Amino acid sequence: MTVQTSKNPQVDIAEDNAFFPSEYSLSQYTSPVSDLDGVDYPKPYRGKHKILVIAADERYLPTDNGKLFSTGNHPIETLLPLYHLHAAGFEFEVATISGLMTKFEYWAMPHKDEKVMPFFEQHKSLFRNPKKLADVVASLNADSEYAAIFVPGGHGALIGLPESQDVAAALQWAIKNDRFVISLCHGPAAFLALRHSDNPLNGYSICAFPDAADKQTPDIGYMPGHLTWYFGEELKKMGMNIINDDITGRVHKDRKRLTGDSPFAANALGKLAAQEMLAAYAS
């Protein structure tokens, strides 16, 4: 007998009118173990350069009907790229706009993954006690030790990051100083912070989560309502080219901008980023 799982969003009792994804959508799009593989870096980086992770610090995303989607950074999209980069020798620091702790979509955590979960536990304090992004930005110069900025996905990236002057300043610094910018899924929404000032990403091509897919997710109860705006439309208005219109786990390199389309791209993006950064920084 087949057990039918509900497509109704699940109540998040920690906040009024807030919801987690439905049982059905979680059964389709999450797994207790990840697809982590290919972590093979026999000559890891041994220098001082590291990764700056710009993480989400807000959990609740309003939808068009007033209901709140309980979100944050997607664990797979955050941890798999970082696992590869760490294995390749690159340490990382975490910053949020407020300096308050990173919010994760714990309902997507691969809680039975014997590699990813110990990695998360090892670095949990970085996410619980991040730097304040404004303080990081104030210290940036041409000699700063950050080799890359990484903006993880999850719908939490739609909250605050697209309007942040500090996010814009960090991205402008990275691009001006020939650093890598790595992102996937909804993470590229952070690039919208550049639209109100100098936009060095005009003309770049990226992968990202398709707006068309976001418009379908309420049908299966992934979100409790529709988004009030769509980041892909806005990225195109600022001169960026989104090369995918579906979700296949695709990754893309445009100079030092490395992007992926979804959580299904997290492992491949991690491998791409590790390989590209080792090639750039290997002594």
Swiss-Prot record:
GO terms for cellular component: cytoplasm. The keyword Zinc applies. The keyword DNA damage applies. Zn(2+) binds at H86, E91, H123. It catalyses: N(omega)-(1-hydroxy-2-oxopropyl)-L-arginyl-[protein] + H2O = lactate + L-arginyl-[protein] + H(+); N(6)-(1-hydroxy-2-oxopropyl)-L-lysyl-[protein] + H2O = lactate + L-lysyl-[protein] + H(+); S-(1-hydroxy-2-oxopropyl)-L-cysteinyl-[protein] + H2O = lactate + L-cysteinyl-[protein] + H(+); N(omega)-(1-hydroxy-2-oxoethyl)-L-arginyl-[protein] + H2O = L-arginyl-[protein] + glycolate + H(+). Signal peptide: none annotated. It comes from the Bacteria. Keywords: Cytoplasm, DNA damage, DNA repair, Hydrolase, Metal-binding, Stress response, Zinc. Disulfide bonds: none annotated. It is found in: Cytoplasm. GO terms for molecular function: glyoxalase III activity; protein deglycase activity; thiolester hydrolase activity; zinc ion binding. Its EC number is 3.1.2.-, 3.5.1.-, 3.5.1.124. Induction: By heat shock. GO terms for biological process: DNA repair; methylglyoxal catabolic process to D-lactate via S-lactoyl-glutathione; protein repair. It is an enzyme of class 3 (hydrolase). InterPro entries: Class_I_gatase-like (IPR029062), HchA (IPR017283), Prot/Nucl_acid_deglycase (IPR050325). The active site is at C185 (nucleophile). Homodimer. Belongs to the peptidase C56 family. HchA subfamily. Protein and nucleotide deglycase that catalyzes the deglycation of the Maillard adducts formed between amino groups of proteins or nucleotides and reactive carbonyl groups of glyoxals. Thus, functions as a protein deglycase that repairs methylglyoxal- and glyoxal-glycated proteins, and releases repaired proteins and lactate or glycolate, respectively. Deglycates cysteine, arginine and lysine residues in proteins, and thus reactivates these proteins by reversing glycation by glyoxals. HAMAP family: Deglycase_HchA. This is Protein/nucleic acid deglycase HchA.
